[in-house]
UniProtKB/Swiss-Prot annotation:
This is Iron-sulfur cluster assembly 1 homolog, mitochondrial. Residues 1-12 form a transit peptide. Interacts with CRY2, but not with CRY1 (in vitro). It comes from Homo sapiens. GO terms for biological process: iron-sulfur cluster assembly. Pfam families: Fe-S_biosyn. Detected in cerebellum, kidney and heart.
Length: 129
């Protein structure tokens, strides 16, 4: 059984110079540190899982959950000691995406900077590709 993590939003990125990488998803140092902090309180979990669900005004939304195991069709990204599993349904939507963690006075959230997005809703929680 998995538990929801925290809020996540998505940003369309234009004219981003893609860097060659073998991983479908890269993490910023801020995202790595936050995931490590969250997993410290959940020793029974091995990482976080990114999924995609149909919802919102633009069609798709990312989900983040704690996970205890790697699913058979999950892609695994290991970066700086953090394990992120990507559900099969989300793999193509995440190619070239950077996962960041942003905090300010009003909110804190994971942000997916995705160069493949064609549009987002006003709040940034749903997108289309």
């Amino acid at each position: 059984m998995s538990a929801s993590l925290v809020r996540a939003t998505v940003r369309a990125v234009s004219k981003r110079k893609l860097q060659p990488t073998r991983a479908a998803l890269t993490l910023t140092p801020s995202a790595v540190n936050k995931i490590k902090q969250l997993l410290k309180d959940k020793p029974e979990h091995v990482g976080v899982k990114v999924g995609v669900r149909t919802r919102g005004c633009n069609g798709l939304s990312y989900t983040l959950e704690y996970t205890k195991t790697k699913g058979d069709s999950d892609e695994e990204v290991i970066q700086d000691g953090v394990r992120v599993f990507i559900e099969k349904k989300a793999q193509l939507t995440l190619l070239g995406t950077e996962m960041d963690y942003v905090e300010d006075k009003l909110s804190s959230e994971f942000v997916f900077n995705n160069p493949n997005i064609k549009g987002t809703c006003g709040c940034g929680e749903s997108f289309n590709i």
